[in-house]
Amino acid sequence: MISLLQAYISQLKFDGFALMSDMVYVTQSAARLMRAIYEMVLAHNWAQLADKALALCKMIDRRMWQSMSPLRQFKKIPVEVVKKIEKKNFPFSRLYDLGPNEIGELIRMPKLGRAIHKYIHQFPKLDLISHIQPITRSTLSIDLTLTPDFQWDDKIHGHSQGFWIFVEDVDSEIVLHHEFFLLKKTFCEDEHTVKMFVPIFEPLPPQYFIRVVSDRWLGSETVLPVSFR
């Protein structure tokens, strides 16, 4: 079954009735089962396992591996173009710093530079700012401001985009708080504030981590350290 799941994500094709029959089961059930596993892991507050489970959910949905370029999720970009970017080993985050002409030069296709630049800036991305305040010796209040930093396109993003907000301990092993944040198209240019209450322990740790991860897009993640020093 693991091999079939890997083949499904890799978009491999099989010959033979038995394998094709098993692949139908994987196609129909894998995403649903993985979502259930993710919810179970999250209920136990296991941060690293939850991160891996959510990533695998998205790999199944997108039929691509996490190691691939996030640009593969834009179906209008030719695969050959994405492969060129992947072969460059150019970090996706650094593509934001390039203009259309520079992107065209990078892939040696000047005419496609503007289109690729547009897709890069349509990739779901949120900027984060936090304000913390102790409430009691064991409770901390966090006001998290989320600001969308991408260009909305109805054909790509629909009417809303979902994100998971995690507050993790200093070792990123325990989820101290989690909630689902739904960004609607109507408010895609506005700042949004989420108020959270999380436990604190003695001795006081140096910091917590806030991670905001897209529910559907591989590679869409923002991490904000919250220092207590």
Protein language model regions, located:
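Beta-rich interaction modules in large eukaryotic scaffold/regulatory proteins
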Residues: 98, 105-152, 156-206, 212-229
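C-terminal helical accessory/scaffold domains
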Residues: 1-81, 86-87, 91-92, 96-97, ...
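Extended, compositionally simple hydrophobic/Ser/Thr-rich segments
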Residues: 82, 104-105
